[in-house]
């Protein structure tokens, strides 16, 4: 068998942690998903690299499989979980957009993903204030199925797409509220959520 804290007997596995984070992001446990990502960022910043396995105290285990397994799982967790960008067509001609950025401490950020081989890029800019939040999405011409996480204790008063008011449906996932709507993008759209401040 393995000693306590090694391999299947208690080691911390980045490739498992990445999948757990993605599942948390996509099933109503968004804050837990971010907590996992944040702790992994701290490990990488501390060590300057990624280990295949870690001891429960966070120190690296010197041998094992390829570190790229863990890196790939975390990239997927950020791409499809935190940023919530999923290509459900061909080269993003149809995509799911379900960002979880409100659970992070960032008030403004930019996220870029895509396919290097065919120069397909999805570029998202996010900003949140006391009045609302906004996403500017640069992408190939596509149909975008949007599933937008609302910040805790916030409700949507109005939703605008490129300055025009848009209808949406509320969906509760666990304890998290989402706004659901579909849009057609010709390369760039702006999504603006105005918060209802009457219940704050």
Language model regions located:
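Short helix-capping and inter-helix turn/linker motifs at the boundaries of alpha-helical repeat units
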Residues: 10-12
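Non-catalytic C-terminal accessory modules of carbohydrate-active enzymes
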Residues: 2, 6, 19-200
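Alpha-helix N-cap/N′ positions at the starts of helices
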Residues: 15-16
């Amino acid at each position: 068998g393995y000693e306590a804290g090694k391999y299947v007997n208690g080691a911390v596995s980045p490739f498992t942690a990445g999948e757990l984070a993605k599942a948390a992001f996509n099933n109503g446990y968004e804050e837990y998903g971010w907590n996992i990502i944040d702790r992994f960022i701290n490990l990488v910043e501390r060590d300057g690299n990624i280990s295949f396995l870690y001891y429960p105290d966070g120190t690296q285990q010197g041998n094992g499989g390829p570190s790229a397994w863990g890196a790939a799982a975390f990239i997927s967790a950020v791409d499809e979980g935190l940023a919530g960008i999923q290509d459900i067509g061909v080269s993003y001609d149809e995509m799911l957009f379900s960002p979880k950025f409100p659970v992070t401490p960032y008030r403004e950020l930019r996220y870029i993903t895509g396919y290097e081989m065919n120069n397909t890029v999805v570029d998202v800019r996010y900003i949140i204030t006391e009045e609302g939040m906004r996403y500017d999405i640069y992408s190939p011409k596509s149909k975008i199925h949007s599933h937008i996480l609302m910040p805790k204790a916030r409700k949507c008063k109005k939703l605008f797409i490129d300055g025009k008011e848009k209808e949406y449906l509320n969906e509760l996932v666990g304890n998290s509220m989402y706004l659901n709507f579909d849009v057609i993008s010709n390369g760039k759209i702006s999504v603006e959520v105005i918060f209802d401040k009457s219940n704050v």
